[in-house]
Regions:
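Short glycine/proline- and aromatic-enriched beta-strand/turn motifs that initiate or cap beta-hairpins
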Residues: 16-60, 172, 177-192
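Residues on the lipid-exposed face of transmembrane beta-strands in outer-membrane beta-barrel proteins
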Residues: 31-35, 51-57, 98-105, 117-121, ...
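Short loop/turn motifs that connect adjacent beta-strands in outer-membrane beta-barrel proteins
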Residues: 19-26, 60-72, 106-112, 148-154, ...
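Residues that define the transmembrane beta-barrel architecture of outer-membrane proteins
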Residues: 25-27, 45-51, 90-97, 111, ...
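Bacterial N-terminal signal peptides
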Residues: 3-14
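Extracellular loop and loop/strand-boundary signature of outer-membrane beta-barrel proteins
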Residues: 39-41, 86-88, 125-131, 166-172
């Protein structure tokens, strides 16, 4: 954990001036990696590591009052790397999240917090969890923040992920995990 915090501090300390924050008509491009472990509510003893690419469209100007003030963004994620470390095997897979609903709160200095709901599909070489199916769906919720920099931003978030085959196979116990995700990206404004 100390190493992770040291890397985050080093990565964010190289940014001196603030870049464009999420704005209506702007776009987000990001590469990210994350990982975590299963929690109660499904099959346990499973670790998850994943990495992907994001493209987002900021659709609205700022609205709502007070601390809720922010902008709505729609995003898609391509996930070329997905590993599920299960007690009996390691499943390798790919995923695609075509539904990313993100609320970018009003920025405070270089910090731009956000909430996100995401949904998509996961295809693996082994059943996830074991004895179920190789085709699954992913529902996710995340709370994070962008640290805006001169050329790029660093994103850090806490993500809850539910993986389930949605009844395509029986049984359908699913896997629930809590993950930490780190991303490096850029917001492009309307005029970039």
């Amino acid at each position: 954990m100390r190493s992770f915090l040291a890397v985050m501090l080093l990565a964010t300390s190289t940014f001196v001036t603030a870049q464009a924050a999420p704005e209506k008509g702007g776009h987000e491009v990001q590469i990210w990696a994350g990982g975590g472990h299963s929690v109660s509510g499904g099959r346990g003893q499973t670790g998850v590591v994943n990495a992907g690419l994001r493209y987002g469209w900021v659709l609205t100007d700022s609205h709502l009052p007070g601390f809720l003030r922010g902008r709505f963004e729609y995003a898609v994620d391509a996930i070329p790397v997905f590993l599920a470390f299960q007690p009996t095997n390691t499943a390798y897979g790919v995923g695609f999240d075509p539904l990313g609903l993100k609320w970018n709160f009003q920025r405070h200095g270089r910090i731009s917090p956000y909430l996100e709901l995401t949904g998509g599909v996961l295809l693996t070489n082994h059943d996830v969890p074991r004895g179920t199916n190789t085709v699954n769906f992913m529902d996710q919720a995340a709370l994070g923040m962008h640290v805006l920099g001169a050329k790029h931003n660093v994103s850090l978030e806490l993500r809850y992920m539910h993986i389930s085959n949605a009844g395509l196979a029986t049984p359908n116990p699913g896997i629930n995990s809590v993950q930490v995700r780190l991303g490096i990206g850029k917001f492009f404004g309307r005029h970039d």
